[in-house]
Structure formats: structure tokens, C-alpha cells
Amino acid sequence: MGTNKPVVIGIAGGSGSGKTSVTKAIFDHFKGHSILILEQDYYYKDQSHLPMEERLKTNYDHPLAFDNDLLIEHLQQLLAYEQIDKPVYDYTLHTRSEEIIPVEPKDVIILEGILILEDPRLCELMDIKLFVDTDADLRILRRMQRDIKERGRTMDSVIDQYVNVVRPMHNQFIEPSKKFADIIIPEGGQNHVAIDIMVTKIATILEQKVNL
């Protein structure tokens, strides 16, 4: 465990942009080190007080869908080298699960999510802010493949959700948050040059913290 504050790397971008691929590439490079991934997707608000018909209306691409207060509290605890109990979201019941995941503090924290750069409070806690920028056509294709294969969705339902929810929310909230990024990575996880540059930058920051 380091004596200094952990390094926080924020990785944002639209759904299907390749955030997870970039996150995994960075994590794999430093997996011999003290590193963890904290996903914003785990921090959707608890909706157990709402009837199912109301939960089904949830817009998961809107900033208000996230419990950023809890996410910030947990991130601050990790920065103080304290363990957290990460919540788990049940997409079947559209509310927070009773399950929790204990997370031990690490020297490097990768914070990943579509809207992490939209909240100034989260931005203030990040040492490096990345935005994974990928063409909209490629993002919808990736989302269709994921939702049909992994979540049992129909193609029509995925397209309908993209047109009526995902695209408008991306244009209104996610795309504008790109201006808060320190580095923009085009072509998502396929951009190995950009990922290598990021790995070098992170290694430099880690070395500087060790030598403080």
C-alpha cells in the first residue's frame, strides 16, 4: 500500500465506444501492480421503492439515473485507503441488488463510465481524464451485438432504444463532457498507439508518486 494518495484514471465515452477495451488494456498492463476498476454502471440509483412499471421507464443514459453521491463517497474512501462495499445493480428487477462486493483499496483506481466527466465533483478526484471517441455507427453496432447476445434483447428493441434514448442522451450529455477530458482516444480499444502512450503516462505518474 502506498503512502501517497492513489492515482485515479477516469475513462469516459459513449455506449459501445470501447471504454471497456481501453480499461482492460490499461488494467492488464498494470495487473502486477496494486490496481482496481470502479464502474459507474454499478452505481445506478436504488429503485426498490418504485413499482415495476415505474422502474421500466428508467433512462439509464441520463445523469440523474446514477447515484453519484454514493460513488463519490466510495471514491473518497478508496483515496483514503479504506475498504468499500460496492453496490450491485440488478438489470432484471431494475433496482439495486441486496448483494454487495467488498473492494479493497489500491494504488491505482480506474473509474469507468459513460457520464463520469459530466459531474464536476468526480472530475476533481481524477488525476487523468480520458474520453474514448468512436464513430456513432460503430457504437450502435457494438451495442446491438452486446444487448442481443448478452441481454436477450431483440434487434427492434435495441434500435428503438438507441433512436429514442441513447442517441439523444449521448448528444445532450456525453458528447459535451468530452471537453473536460485531458486526452481523447479516437477509435476506442483499437487505438493501440494511444493506449501505449497512456500506459507510459500512468507509469510516469506512479513513479513520481513513489519518489515523493
Curated annotation (Swiss-Prot):
Q: Which pathway is recorded for this entry?
A: Pyrimidine metabolism; CTP biosynthesis via salvage pathway; CTP from cytidine: step 1/3; Pyrimidine metabolism; UMP biosynthesis via salvage pathway; UMP from uridine: step 1/1
Which CDD domains does UniProt cross-reference here? UMPK
Q: Which Gene3D superfamilies match?
A: P-loop containing nucleotide triphosphate hydrolases (3.40.50.300)
Q: Which residues form a coiled coil?
A: none
Query: EC number(s) of the enzyme?
Result: 2.7.1.48
Q: Which InterPro entries match?
A: P-loop_NTPase (IPR027417), PRK/URK (IPR006083), Uridine_kinase (IPR026008), Uridine_kinase-like (IPR000764)
Record carries keyword ATP-binding: yes
Keywords carried by this UniProt record: ATP-binding, Cytoplasm, Kinase, Nucleotide-binding, Transferase
Protein known as: Uridine kinase
